[in-house]
């Protein structure tokens, strides 16, 4: 039994993941497990404005999904982390619904309030069912 992980790297960001020593996504048994994606610029720094940070987190997520031959339509489970959700959740959720969520059936979703995300305000991690051709 091989212990090698089938890691997926989006184009242009491998050095960032290697520096922080984690995999952006791992394929296993027809599923794609995507690490938490934040609104980080190419150098890893946070996008300062909240809405821009959420959009960039989704761009980064979509790049990982695309590198595996998937899209957000293949996502079956979503976990989002929000710093200070009492003041930010509604603004973030309305943006997510309007720009990224898509049509029903929707993935399962869990939102978790946290106190710290290494300078970020929003993080999203997902599990996707890979299309047959990408599995």
PLM features per residue range, with description:
Residues 1-59, 63-76, 82-135:
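N-terminal presequence-like segments and the immediate start of the first folded domain
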